[in-house]
Amino acid sequence: MIEYRNLRIAVLGAGAVGAQVVRLLLEQGEDLAGRAGAGLELVGVAVRNPDAPRTADIPRKLLTTDAESLILGADVVIELMGGIEPARSHILQALNSGADVITANKAL
């Protein structure tokens, strides 16, 4: 079996799109890792309210309201919050910390 280096992934936002991205990372992580050529470790999901209902079952231990700390521990940040702020600030923080950023944010 091939061993890949792990990429630590942080997801910002768990609305309709974010929750489904998290679901795919959790359910198809091994397949995605093979395609990416790297292990994928979901380190957390930043949300406004950890107790809000979600469209996917996200383990409570992955949810946090501390996006800044989550970003600092990530190699890849997937921004799916929408809007301009705080998404813009979080993206800039991620880039400044050396993380790669993926976003579907049309406002930015």
Positions of the model-derived regions?
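N-terminal glycine-/serine-/threonine-rich beta1-alpha1-beta2 phosphate-ribose binding loop
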Residues: M1-A99
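Short, acidic/turn-prone active-site loops that include or flank metal/cofactor-
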Residues: E68, K106-L108
